[in-house]
Amino acid sequence: MLDVCLLGTAGMMPLPNRWLTALSLKYNGSNILIDCGEGTQIAMKEAGINFKPIDILCITHFHADHISGLPGLLLTMGNAERTEPLTIIGPKGLTRVVTALRTIAPELPFEIKCIELNEQDEYFEMNGYHIHAFRVKHAVLCYGYSVEIKRSGRFSVERAKEKEIPMRLWNPLQKGNTVEFEGRVYTPDMVLGPARKGIKVTYCTDSRPLEHIVEAAEGSDLFICEGMYAEKEKIVKAKQYKHMTFYEAAEMAKRAGVKELWLTHFSPSLVRADDYMPQVRDIFANAYLGKDGKSVELMFDED
């Protein structure tokens, strides 16, 4: 099970009912935070999300509405007596930016490990998360993120017995570990069937539509994508400032074959957003407006 909570849906500036951009993902006691705009701490408190288990922070880019909440969050994590290292992933220049922001949070009881993205696509495996960082098209260097929880094949007692694998090795093999025992090497594929479908969430904000985004989001259970503008005539502004309209996000969701779309990162000028959703659903039926605190528990498929 993967817990997803959209903490902030505002772009550019916070509003009374919209904190700036942030997304929380929780799996097996570990949290990923994607972006950390102003108000993220309050949004986490409102959603009942603990600060301490955040192990990984993914930053899309260095515009203030996506990173201005970081110094305060680091201080709060330090005050919670956290000692475990925090990994921060972000575009080239991340170390310099984090160092500058830490001017007001200089002494922390935990280590910060910065991973700078340099390639078009980069992949990481941490704490059971498979993270794909993919470059998008904004006014500055910017990345989207797909986070996947993979699922191994079903354990076969029959195969284990056929291969005379000692019962004491079944559990580590079932967990995907290779084991050496009494001079013989045992691998998970000896006892596991084909890999089963996992859970995938893709998050993209601050970009023009790209085939690269469609490819990264393909097959996602949930696609969280910016819809900066809802008014169709604002396509001109979207192109000028490298953002998307509701309808462009819906087109990408349709082409990527995702199960569900949440729109987010709204312009401060956007009001009565619900009025535009019928037109959006004409393009992609399973589209919804993101709201601060909107959450879902994504489950593995029954099989």
Residue ranges and their predicted role:
Residues R96-T103, C114-E119:
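A gly/proline- and charged-residue-enriched helix-loop-helix capping module
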Residues M1-A47, P85, Y145-V147, G193-C204, ...:
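Conserved beta-strand hairpin/beta-sheet module of binuclear metal-dependent hydrolase folds
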Residues G69-M77, V98-L101, V271-Q279:
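Metal-dependent catalytic neighborhoods of phosphoester/phosphodiester hydrolases
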Residues E38-I89, K113-N118:
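Active-site metal-binding motif and surrounding structural segment of the metallo-beta-lactamase
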Residues I34-G37, I54-F62, G90-P91, T202-S207, ...:
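Active-site neighborhood of phospho(di)ester-bond hydrolases with catalytic His/Asp-centered motifs
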Residues C5, I89, K113-N118, H132-F134, ...:
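General small-molecule cofactor/ligand-binding pocket signal
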Residues K26-N28, P53-I54, A80-P85, R255-W262:
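Short, surface-exposed connector motifs at secondary-structure boundaries
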Residues N118-L263, R272-I283, M299-D303:
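Metal-dependent phosphodiesterase/nuclease catalytic metal-binding core
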